[in-house]
């Protein structure tokens, strides 16, 4: 079964581009305003926070994800000068071409390996 990934962002073009880049997985895209509801509706294997989500909103969404799942897998896309969102998130730099796809594969593969132990 394909992993379920929620991509949260406030730029529709970036959301479509990222969904296409990650088409090997089952993707849902949503803006940050509607992300809380999307998180409540179903569990996701990975939540991706775009750099278009303001840091305060990203922190709120991370807190909400923690309420719903004690071990959420969250990937934050950040430009090199952004502050970290905390140790609960994986981070990928926009300056690395193909970095998003490889980071997602690495995170999801790690979870499969960990659950098989």
Kindly label every feature range from the protein language model.
Residues 3-5:
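Conserved hydrophobic helix-helix packing surfaces used for dimerization/oligomerization
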Residues 9-30:
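Two-component/phosphorelay signaling modules centered on CheY-like receiver
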Residues 11-14, 43-52, 83-93:
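Conserved N-terminal glycine/acidic-rich loop preference
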Residues 18-22, 38-41, 80-89:
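Short loop/helix-cap segments at secondary-structure boundaries that form the rim of catalytic
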Residues 29-46:
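Acidic, metal-coordinating helix/loop segments flanking the phosphotransfer/catalytic sites
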Residues 31, 75-117:
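Output/docking surface of receiver
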Residues 43, 67-75:
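His-Asp phosphorelay/catalytic-motif detector in bacterial-type signaling
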Residues 49-69, 79:
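Conserved phosphotransfer microenvironments
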